[in-house]
Amino acid sequence: MVRLSNLVSCLGLASAVTAAVVDLVPKNFDDVVLKSGKPALVEFFAPWCGHCKNLAPVYEELGQAFAHASDKVTVGKVDADEHRDLGRKFGVQGFPTLKWFDGKSDEPEDYKGGRDLESLSSFISEKTGVKPRGPKKEPSKVEMLNDATFKGAVGGDNDVLVAFTAPWCGHCKNLAPTWEALANDFVLEPNVVIAKVDADAENGKATAREQGVSGYPTIKFFPKGSTESVPYEGARSEQAFIDFLNEKTGTHRTVGGGLDTKAGTIASLDELIASTSAADLAAAVKKAATELKDKYAQYYVKVADKLSQNAEYAAKELARLEKILAKGGSAPEKVDDLISRSNILRKFVGEEKEAKDEL
């Protein structure tokens, strides 16, 4: 009977130790955390704590991500409401509290980063050199900012749209997939940044205070060259965010990351095309383009020059580009270029059709 009891006890202990997230109690804490020589990230939680409940699925996923390296690092948790002596021993005053133990001493380091999977995984990897494993996910295009990086991210050459969020906030959770989609929509815009600050994390609270954040999510736009923000007060749909950014930054994105019919076009040159005779168009466009720094100004010059030699050039070239786009398979950057050039060609084709109608 004693042997069976011991066996059950051992099996229970083994189960606790080999689980993705190790359940720590006074009986095994010292052996697993303090004397093992193996570092550990430990969450001190209480079952009734709302923030703890929100963290629970993320923390379980974290344990799974490092389960392959259980001989190198431990992801553990302590019910500090039941085992209050353990909580008091390490100065736990609120829940959840996360602490990093080096496996050699009883003086842990407070974890002050974000409570999302990416932040927690990065912390463990930086400490141990161990990389997380799990279902392959496309890396997020949202730039995570904190107290150390925020000031360097705004006020420079980029337009920055920032969401100040908290992991326990229901509205923030609803916003998250839209925010990810928005970041993907603008991934090819080198000077537009979609960012996020975990305002509930220790390394994000100071920035949130400085920015006057009092509720979540709070969304602010920082124009390039300015550290003064513009509050975003519109709808929280992907389309609404895209419309806002297109207006503020001069981009032409659509839902899904494509380009609209104005992308690549230059209003002043379009007006010139509409008001200049075919005979004078090439010279007029070339002269006007010399004063422009726009990426596609010289493409206008090229098309106008080609048209002066072949009146069907724009129509034929447009048909060729549309065929390439319809076929698919081009790199995203190439698709952007094809759409922009097609939009420009349509300006010339429209003028050609009007000229033929007059004849």
Swiss-Prot record:
Swiss-Prot/TrEMBL induction comment: By stress, and tunicamycin.
Primary subcellular site in the record, as a coarse category: endoplasmic reticulum
EC number: 5.3.4.1
Residue(s) at site: Lowers pKa of C-terminal Cys of second active site: R236
One Gene Ontology term from the biological process aspect of the record: protein folding
Claim: Zinc is one of the keywords in the record: no
Superkingdom of origin: Eukaryota
Signal sequence extent: 1-19
InterPro entries: ERp29_C, ERp29_C_sf, PDI, PDI_thioredoxin-like_dom, Thioredoxin-like_sf, Thioredoxin_CS, Thioredoxin_domain
UniProt motif (Prevents secretion from ER) ranges: 356-359
Location in the cell: Endoplasmic reticulum lumen
GO terms, molecular function: protein disulfide isomerase activity; unfolded protein binding
Site positions for Lowers pKa of C-terminal Cys of first active site: R115
Keywords noted in UniProt: Disulfide bond, Endoplasmic reticulum, Isomerase, Redox-active center, Repeat, Signal, Stress response
Disulfide bonds: C49-C52, C169-C172
Record-stated family: Belongs to the protein disulfide isomerase family.
Name of this chain's protein: Protein disulfide-isomerase tigA
The organism of origin for this protein: Aspergillus niger
